[in-house]
C-alpha cells in the first residue's frame, strides 16, 4: 500500500483537496485501491510525520514561505527588493528557516529516502523575474494610499513573508561536510520558467489580456498576504479582502497594460537523499 500525506496549514481548504483527489480525471490515485491519501494540518516548521517514516517527500513552492516576517521593508513589500538592515534580516531568517526545514524533514525520512524540493529562486546577483510585476503592484499600493483606499500605516505593514533563495543559499548547509543532518545533494538546478501569458501576448498582441492574466496571478498568490495587514481584515471584515484586491488588481492592470513586460521566473529544484 502507498500512503500519501498532504501537509498544509490548518486553515487550508482540505475539502477541496479531497474533492480533486476523488473526481479529477488526472488524479494520481485514479482507481488504485492501494493508494491512500491523507491530510495533516500543521506547519512544516514543526515535525509533521513520525521519525524514519517517509520514503519519498515532495515540496512544491511552499518552502519559499518563512516561519515569520523578520522585518518591515521600507518603501516596498517584496523581500528581494529590500536593502540594508531589512535585507540582512531576511537573509538571516531565510538561512535559519532552510536549515530548520531540512532538519525536520531529515528526521522524518527513512534511510535511503529522497526529498524533492521545488521553489522559486533568484539569480546569484539577486535578480528576480518578478521584480517588475512587484514594482507595478508597489506603485499601485502607493496610489491607494494617496486615494485613502488604505492608510499609510496599513501599507507599511504589508510585507510578503516569502524568501526566494539563490542556488548558493540552498547548497550552503551542505558545503562544510558534504552532508547536513545525514542529507546529501543528488541534484540541484535553477532554470527559467517562461511566462505563459507573455507567450499568448506574442501571438495576439492583446495588452489588456496580458495585464489581466499577470494581475490575476498576483492576486491569487500574493494579495491575501498583503491584505492581512488591513485593519478591517484583522477585525474580521469578510469583505475587506475582496474590495482591497479589486482595487489593487485594477491599478496593476492599468499599469501593466501600458508597459507590457514578461514575468519569466527562476525555479529551483533540489533533490536530497538520506544516508543509510
Where are these regions (language model features)?
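Conserved SAM-binding motif I beta-strand of class I
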Residues: 3-8
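Conserved beta-strand elements of beta-rich interaction domains across eukaryotes
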Residues: 9-12, 64, 122-124, 190, ...
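S-adenosyl-L-methionine
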Residues: 14-47
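A Trp-anchored, charged/polar loop motif used as the substrate-binding/catalytic surface
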Residues: 40-43, 86, 91-104, 165-172
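Mobile active-site "lid"/loop adjacent to the S-adenosyl-L-methionine
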Residues: 59-100, 108, 119-158
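Substrate-binding/catalytic lobe of Class I Rossmann-like enzymes that use SAM or dcSAM, i.e.
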Residues: 111-236
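Core SAM-dependent methyltransferase catalytic element
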Residues: 178, 263-276
Amino acid at each position: 500500500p502507498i500512503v500519501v500525506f498532504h501537509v498544509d496549514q490548518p486553515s487550508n481548504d482540505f475539502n477541496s483537496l479531497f474533492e480533486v483527489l476523488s473526481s479529477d480525471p488526472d488524479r494520481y490515485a485514479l482507481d488504485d485501491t492501494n493508494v491512500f491519501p491523507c491530510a495533516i494540518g500543521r506547519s512544516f516548521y514543526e515535525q509533521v510525520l513520525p521519525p524514519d517514516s517517509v520514503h519519498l517527500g515532495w515540496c512544491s513552492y511552499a518552502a519559499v514561505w518563512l516561519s515569520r516576517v523578520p522585518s518591515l521593508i521600507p518603501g516596498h513589500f517584496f523581500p528581494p527588493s529590500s536593502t540594508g538592515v531589512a535585507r540582512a534580516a531576511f537573509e538571516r531568517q531565510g538561512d535559519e528557516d532552510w536549515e530548520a526545514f531540512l532538519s525536520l524533514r531529515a528526521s522524518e525520512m527513512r534511510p535511503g529516502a529522497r526529498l524533492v524540493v521545488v521553489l522559486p529562486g533568484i539569480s546569484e546577483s539577486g535578480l528576480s523575474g518578478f521584480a517588475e510585476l512587484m514594482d507595478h503592484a508597489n506603485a499601485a499600493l502607493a496610489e491607494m494610499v494617496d486615494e485613502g483606499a488604505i492608510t499609510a500605516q496599513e501599507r507599511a505593514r504589508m510585507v510578503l513573508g516569502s524568501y526566494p533563495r539563490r542556488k548558493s543559499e540552498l547548497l550552503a548547509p551542505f558545503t562544510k561536510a558534504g552532508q547536513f543532518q545525514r542529507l546529501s545533494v543528488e541534484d540541484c538546478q535553477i532554470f527559467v520558467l517562461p511566462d505563459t501569458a507573455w507567450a499568448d501576448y506574442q501571438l495576439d498582441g492583446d495588452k489588456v489580456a496580458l495585464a489581466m492574466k499577470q494581475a490575476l496571478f498576483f492576486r491569487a498568490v500574493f494579495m491575501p498576504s498583503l491584505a492581512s495587514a488591513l485593519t478591517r481584515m484583522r477585525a474580521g471584515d469578510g469583505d475587506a479582502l475582496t474590495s482591497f484586491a479589486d482595487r489593487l488588481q485594477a491599478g496593476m492592470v492599468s499599469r501593466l497594460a501600458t508597459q507590457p513586460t514578461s514575468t519569466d521566473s527562476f525555479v529551483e529544484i533540489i533533490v536530497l537523499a538520506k544516508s543509510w
